[in-house]
């Protein structure tokens, strides 16, 4: 089932320097909660400045949903330590609140009024909040409070020069984009390995079902928790953060222009379902527009091709201008065993897997085949640890045992690990392979199995509160290592100033501005 990558791996072993200079970044979302686990109703902490313009800490859907962002970094330890500094400083400035350590929220009642993230009075700030109003009205606020980790990854120019013979300009744009699309297609085919190893949401609180009937064979504990005994990541299931209305958009990952055309089509295609919501009620705007996607970011995807946007540029315009610059992996649950929601083992694994995905052959995929890849993901998400589970290739009928496929993949990853270790010295990457491959013979070692044992004992709420309290105490006590207190104070003031400048620069009323930008 695994493509034959031996030639590409041999090439890599001859050109190890091609992997020198991998760049990465992390984003981690987390809900601010009270000591009893309920959602904090306070505004964004003053110590963190402006959520609109702060370079390290912002908010996602809700005012209480923090998002930590590391700068682009070539050093794994430095990136993780900086992420930890962001958590340390925040923990010291949350009063009695703490950061929820799980992807799935718990103490949020159906229909509870969740305050949307606020970004001030500028047109762009109001647009961001209106977009979130649209998300709430389309999908419900509860789904939007699910948290995850995003891992951003780019290969050095030396890789593309050695592999594809790229030179500067248009040639580089096309060849590098084609290489990243190959990575993305392989991710759709084999990325289920991420929830298998690191999925950490095998259970949900009853409020998540919102009284709707479900065909999933949930088991229920006395405290009202629903779980599937072999599930890995319900966050990635239809109960979690997905968007069924997008599955027939026909967006593919074969070609830059084709992909962008599909994306642009989706933001212009009217939706009868969303038209029923309306654009306004009692003088209050309900969504940016009633199209299938309000803006491009609404496209749900487990992985995204990205380029840093310039002022006023949409994500797809940036891609057309310069091609794909980096990849955003979006399938990581919060790691409940780490105070910062992600750890070094995961980052090293993702490095290895991304390199494998860019090396392995990846035939072009129609939108139908893209949908077929969802079958494997769903199996792993809902019953990944089930004995005897099999997976298929695309839309074909042949089936293969998951543990065998996983171990075959890791045989390749071990060779990538040896190459990366040869550049950096030590055996860190190989050690990660040895630790993780054991999960295929013993699923009890996976994140989902480990956290489910705790959840069955004390419930999602009990588990989340205990971990949240422990991490709060730990982070508050740890000294900062890279950033200093004065760096945070300076950024608080600078971000507040930048927000005021954005607000002062607006010349049009919001409604008129929105007509042009929506």
Curated annotation (Swiss-Prot):
The keyword Phosphoprotein does not apply. Gene3D superfamilies: 3.30.590.20. Its EC number is 6.3.2.2. It is an enzyme of class 6 (ligase). Keywords: ATP-binding, Glutathione biosynthesis, Ligase, Nucleotide-binding. GO terms for cellular component: cytosol. GO terms for molecular function: ATP binding; glutamate-cysteine ligase activity; metal ion binding. The keyword Transcription regulation does not apply. InterPro entries: Gln_synth/guanido_kin_cat_dom (IPR014746), Glu_cys_ligase (IPR007370), Glut_cys_ligase (IPR006334). Belongs to the glutamate--cysteine ligase type 1 family. Type 1 subfamily. This is Glutamate--cysteine ligase. The gene is gshA.
